[in-house]
């Protein structure tokens, strides 16, 4: 489990994160959403120890990530949005670098590469960006870490590859893992991320499971307009509208509509979910 308390970080005089408090529990795939520049990547790098908190604390199973303790380093993996094109075959990379993670499984790496339809014998510096990204995704999953942080993992992937990514993440991660995926392409991950974290500048607007969200908000997909809806958008065949769930009705959460609703009603949403 990761416990974040009053976390703060700034670049010079520009505060990016301020008083961030939340808990990330085991067995969850968290979606980290937010507009560009709100601190999603900064938060990921703080969680994996690449940056040191300037205020507050991060506790990962009783350890501080920035202390870079080997027992924690070998049990976490950070997949950056920018991945290096090494001058070696993908299989060689996995063999050479996998030894730094005690749970690394070469057979799993090759299996995930197969699921992603990627050639492990191809040199990484001859791959397209999408192929390179899939190589690092396969490596990340093969490390079998408890903590996995991914920054925009579907960037550069075509539509079939995005479906393969969803399949791989749901099939090849540990049951006790804590996975945090930063994305601005919510439709790519809509069926696998739960809970949802929405960051704003220096603040957390929402940190809730889909069950909690559907208990408090109702997502309507009919052609009829609803008076007083918090958010409304025309879609083929009608509208998608978000309202307060005053009647306890079940509905399917649209993460994209949720994101827009939260940004249009920041204080209202914080008040609803912080009760």
Predicted regions and their residues:
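The feature captures the beta-strand-to-loop junction immediately N-terminal to the Walker
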Residues: 33-35
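Helix-to-loop junction immediately C-terminal to a conserved catalytic motif
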Residues: 48
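Conserved ABC transporter NBD signature motif
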Residues: 56-67, 71-72
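ABC-family P-loop ATPase nucleotide-binding domains
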Residues: 77-135
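Catalytic Walker B motif of ABC-type/P-loop ATPase nucleotide-binding domains
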Residues: 148-152
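ABC transporter nucleotide-binding domain
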Residues: 165-180, 184-243
